[in-house]
Amino acid sequence: MAIGVERAVSGIRGAGGGAADVQELGHELSRALSGLVPHDGYMLAGLDPLSQVSCFLSGEHTYSYPSLRHVLLGEFEVSDRHPFTDLWHGASQVGVLGSGVREERNSLRLNEVMAPQGFGSELRIALVAGGLMWGTLALLRERGRACFTAAEAVHAQCLVAPLAHALRRFVARRPPRPLRSARPPAVIVVDGADRIRSATPGSAYWLRACLPGFLGTDDILPITYWHSTFMARSLKGPVVNRVPHPDGWIETRAQPLAGAAAGELAITIQPATTRTLLPALTAWYGVTPREAAVLHEAVEGLPGKQIARRLDVSPHTVNDHLKALYRKFGVSAREELLAALAH
């Protein structure tokens, strides 16, 4: 087993740093896992580390996009087996569905999503590292094949942290950059079932931008906001999602409408602002709290000596933190760093 785990970890590391896009990332991670945990399909989601909603998605031979709303129902509104939040905080970050145990009889995911689409077993993994959940991964087997075993669940548990770090490496594989767009922000109003009631012109462009590489029709685009709307209704407040795009970062915000019908929400989509994006970037790029303090002052335009006085540290310490920030963000100078963060 040790050799198999080491081989899988090596493949996972290569995928995180070498994947050109989200689709390739998912494909290469699936291939790295296939020796230890054979599967027929997968669904990978990266999560905004602050709001915990899906910010990118990749899958092959997996659940249909429309059925993902039923999957979210099992996470937020009904008590289904192995919700990712429970796996995140539980003793194991791996859960298996489809083993035939009594507790699965009323599973919405098993009966309404998996069975109608020909899947008999699911092994889901909460991709946790450093106390945060960076993504989720569901591995699928077709009906008629053996269920995922306890031994395979143990193998998957060994790969939780490497998989989480691979997602971080993928997002942080190059310096951040502002998304330049002359298009106005999109504003979309949805009802309690997440059907679009009204939208500004050009909204489809922004929805599609949140799914780079997506080739489906416009009627499937609401999958880009479903996780945010479920979370906003659960929290009864606004939910911000920061979406990595090949040309920069996109910011989405879902929030309940005052005085509206039950469940109605407004969703705005636009290029991410520095204020919104910076906390997520510090997480993705592994910035320490002290480095983050220096970074926030630098973004405000303060020179090194003034940053030192404000933070009550030496100028030498400030310079050390700035050098660490240059390395983590993949830039060579302060001007380049600030340009990368000028959203």
Task: Give names to the regions the model predicted.
Residues 2-151, 155, 161-165, 169, ...:
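Regulatory input/activation interfaces that engage signals or partners
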Residues 279-287:
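Short amphipathic alpha-helical boundary/capping segments
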Residues 288, 301-336:
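Recognition helix of helix-turn-helix DNA-binding domains
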Residues 298-302, 341:
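Short helix-to-turn junction characteristic of helix-turn-helix DNA-binding domains
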